[in-house]
A protein has these predicted regions:
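Class I S-adenosylmethionine-dependent transferase superfamily signal
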Residues: 17, 43, 115, 138, ...
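Conserved SAM/SAH cofactor-binding pocket of Class I
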Residues: 9-110
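Proline-centered helix-kink/hinge sites
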Residues: 6, 100-101, 120, 148
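Mobile active-site "lid"/loop adjacent to the S-adenosyl-L-methionine
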Residues: 102-133
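Conserved beta-strand termini and adjacent loop/short-helix elements that scaffold enzyme active sites
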Residues: 1, 79-81, 127, 179-181
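Conserved SAM-binding loop and adjacent beta-strand
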Residues: 2-15, 133
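Conserved Class I SAM-dependent methyltransferase catalytic core
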Residues: 128-192
Length: 194
């Protein structure tokens, strides 16, 4: 297994971005932790004039994303980037989106066997001691690469909705909105860079 299997909750996040940007031309988008490439591929098909870049630390995931990009004939720039590196590519975007690892180790025992058997741990788990690890780092990067008024979108762990909102507000993001998924769980966040 090289990437997560796309889920309905991720489709809801994608729909939110499309509804916000469908009438805007030339939207510059960065997807962090692209995995299979499902987020940028759908955005590339629906937001026609968009310029999309996708990063992932895993070469296996990028191979899957490359194949999916070719199958779907979408123009996406894929790059192997570790979000925790201090020297990141110089990029400025209108939208930063991520469905990063967010399952804590203590939640592992309650997971379905097929997820553990078929999806990479690298894309799933965060330490119990720092469940917001990726959200914090991606938001830090967002402060540098999002244009003023740019939008940050996250898929989140339902157990940490309020904490993720507080994190973003504490970092200066504005109009932070927490949304529930189709199952009634806190699952998505949108926030603006001032």
């Amino acid at each position: 297994p090289g990437a997560l299997i796309p889920r309905p909750e991720t489709a809801e996040l994608i729909d939110w971005i499309i509804s916000d940007y469908t009438d805007k031309a030339g939207v510059r988008i960065l997807d962090v932790g692209t995995g299979s490439g499902c987020i940028p591929i759908v955005l590339g098909k629906k937001l026609k004039d968009s310029k999309i870049t996708s990063w992932d630390v895993s070469e296996k995931a990028l191979d899957i994303a490359r194949r999916n990009k070719l199958l779907n004939q979408v123009d996406i720039t894929l790059a192997q980037v570790d979000i925790f590196d201090t020297a990141l590519p110089d990029i400025h975007v209108d939208v930063l989106v991520s469905n990063p690892p967010y399952i804590t180790e203590k939640e592992r025992s309650g997971m379905e066997r097929n997820v553990l058997d078929w999806e990479p741990e690298l894309a799933l788990f965060v330490p119990d001691s720092d469940p917001l690890l990726f959200y914090r780092r991606i938001a830090e990067v967002g402060c540098d690469i999002l244009v003023s008024g740019g939008t940050l979108y996250y898929e989140i762990n339902r157990a940490y909705g309020k904490e993720t909102v507080q994190l973003l507000e504490g970092m200066g993001y504005q109009s932070v909105e927490l949304r529930k998924d189709m199952f009634g769980n806190d699952r998505m966040i949108k926030a603006f860079r001032p």
